């Protein structure tokens, strides 16, 4: 077993198209790159269990064996494929399960949620041994407005309010954002104030192509969303949204992360239009707002600024919940960058890995905040 699993340091998991990597000793002069684990598998998401930091669940996809949830009990060193997988009932879609996009744990660690393609939300109360369909969302009256977007039709973002776990917010591409205040018994569309320029109605109730939704860990009222048409903030748990795109070089992007201590501090990586889908002007730039999106500035020192045509995907950026100011992101070219100062200076952690699908901070001595 690698010494990282017996050490007290923190690690960054990097899920890629060809397996899972682990970067340890983040505070050392020479961080250690380990892996690949789950070699040959697409690792779309990784989530630890609160209170059991070395227990990890991963959303996995393979061209032969399909989509599964995998479990590790030793910090990612060894993995077991769980027999059960979340899927729609036969006949509802052409394929009950194409891929598993996102996993989320309730603060007490008792429930595991999964978002899948075709778009649907599922939960397990027995650590993935069995799954239940959240029918109230998956058969919502507005589902007729949902549709695939460039081949993707997934529920890709799951936010759980840590102060009120019955408050849930999810993002669907392309379906929009939905919220529940009763643990998923009932759901309301949460898209008021959000543009949908690709639809006949500019401000529809549902059907939006949302790329990412995040909730502040200390204040479930504060949400941010990256969309096909703009970046937005909500101050009331998703009931209403304010566009905060002004000051950014584009209104398109995927990756966004908020500061775990200050809900007004948010970082994001804009991309160039819905057609190019790479960094704007061939420059890898991160933008930060310190006032909830009223103003933005580039915080890109240490990042390449010439002929960089890469993509940073929706789960490929993360904020460290236990170390204020530490963020990481990975690119489609397999480069991973880290900052310890909210973007004021970036360092290269790894390069030329397979395409990065997700990054996730974890701590052996603590828990995912």
Predicted segments, located by residue:
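Extracellular glycan-interacting surfaces
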Residues: 1-369
